[in-house]
Each structure stands twice: as C-alpha cells, then as structure tokens.
Amino acid sequence: MERLTFSDAGPADWPYLLCLWWRNVRATHGFVAEDYLRAIGAALPGVYLPAMERVRLAWLEVAPAEGDGSDHAPGAGEGHFPTGTVAVPRPSQGRLPAGFLGSVAQRVEMLFVEPGLRGRGIGTALLEDFGSRHPETLLDVNEQNTAARIFYARRGFEVVGRSPLDGAGQPYPLLHLRRLRAGGAGTGQTA
C-alpha cells in the first residue's frame, strides 16, 4: 500500500469530502434514487458532516508527477457530480484525499474511499485507525451494497440487526454491524 497519512477534517476539508462522497456513491449506490442522492449530497456539508464528533481524512502521498495540480483525483470525472453541486479541489501539497471516516462515539456513520483507489487498503486503514481508539465499532450498511457488506464481513464485522428503512425513513434496508476489538489490542479481529 502507498503511504497514507491521516488528519482530522474540518470545514476547510468539506470540498474534498463532498467530492469523495459523490464519486463513491456514483460507483457503489446505483440502487439509490437520484433525487435522494442529491438531497443527501446537498445536506452533507451543512448537516451531516458538522454532526460528526470526528471526521478522519486519509491522504495518499503522491509523486510530483501525480500530484501536479491536476483538477482530479484518480478515477474522477465531471460525470460523477450533478451539475453545479461541487467544485473539484486540487491535490494538496503532494497528496491526494483518498478516503474519509465520520464517527460519533463508537459508531462509524460514514466511510467512503476514492473509487479509483479502492482495493489498496485505505478503507481498512481508516477502520483500524478508528478501531484503535474504540473497543467496539458499530455501523450500518445498505443491504443492497453487496461490495460493502463483503468488505465489512472480511474485516470481522457481524450482522446484529436489520432495519427495513434507512435513517430517513426511505426504503433502503440497513444491516446493523458490530465488531469487537480482540484483547484490547486494536487488531480488528472479532472477540
């Protein structure tokens, strides 16, 4: 895996997070209605992100040729965003925003990775960074998001419940997942 660094994200980072979110949902949430995605995207910087106790941003260090001021991260394209919703930020100081995790207490509320960087351990690294501070990790995943369900199962998460509706009462069933840290060592294995 390439070198990753983490930082706590704040309002100055919201444009990065919004770009990552749009690219991710375009790649993984084809089952969600477009108007609902737009509503969530519109609320992300003003409602959802500020409601997080902590948002961790994973940065991928890139060689100068890769982080040369290009307007797009790997896999990005104008077709990923509804017109007028987001300005794509430039890479920052030789690094690209690779993913982020938003949390409240021991609950992961959001985890998104740049689609062009999936499979490189970024999501796992964000979960381990979070899990190192919490003996128990809770999260919800859309039941229709098969790739995410497999991702979490491979990292030791177990289904502990199901809701037929999402948190906003929409017909997108959620699976409630839980993972315990083994022996307090932050290994990511279930206890």
Residue ranges: model-predicted function:
Residues G116-D129:
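Conserved acetyl-CoA pyrophosphate-binding loop and the N-cap/start of the following alpha-helix
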Residues R107-R118, N142:
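A short, internal acetyl-CoA/4′-phosphopantetheine-binding micro-motif in the GNAT/acyltransferase core
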Residues R56, G99-L101, Q106, L111, ...:
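Conserved GNAT-family N-acetyltransferase fold
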Residues E53-E66, T83-G99:
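Conserved beta-hairpin
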Residues C19-V47:
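Conserved GNAT-fold acetyl-CoA-binding loop/helix
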Residues G46-W59, R107:
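A short helix-loop-beta-strand connector motif used in the catalytic cores of GNAT acetyltransferases and
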Residues L4-C19:
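A short beta-loop-alpha structural element at the N-terminal edge
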Residues R23, E136-L138, N142-R149, R154-R155, ...:
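C-terminal "cap" of GNAT-fold acetyltransferases
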